[in-house]
Amino acid sequence: MVKLRLKRCGRRQRATYRIIAIDVRSRREGRDLRKVGFYDPIKNQTYLNVPAILYFLEKGAQPTGTVHDISKKAEVFKELRVNQTK
């Protein structure tokens, strides 16, 4: 099963995160299937590759709680529902 989750990057005490699609059995720093976004909690910046996220969600990927909250704030799930009703 594939999950959308955060991968820690950056320096000590200055964490940034990549949002990645990764196999659920892999460790946090393991090899990812694809990078689908970026999140910096200190600067409060977020970049999401929405088509890639929608692709993985349609294939059955499950977002973690934090990734779900970030995606919800960016209104990614509204686009998912629009695509499903077509």
Swiss-Prot record:
GO terms for biological process: mitochondrial translation. Its main location: plastid. GO terms for cellular component: chloroplast; mitochondrion; small ribosomal subunit. One of its GO terms (molecular function) is structural constituent of ribosome. It holds the Pfam family Ribosomal_S16. It comes from the Eukaryota. Keywords: Chloroplast, Plastid, Ribonucleoprotein, Ribosomal protein. It is found in: Plastid, Chloroplast. Belongs to the bacterial ribosomal protein bS16 family. This is Small ribosomal subunit protein bS16c. The gene is rps16.
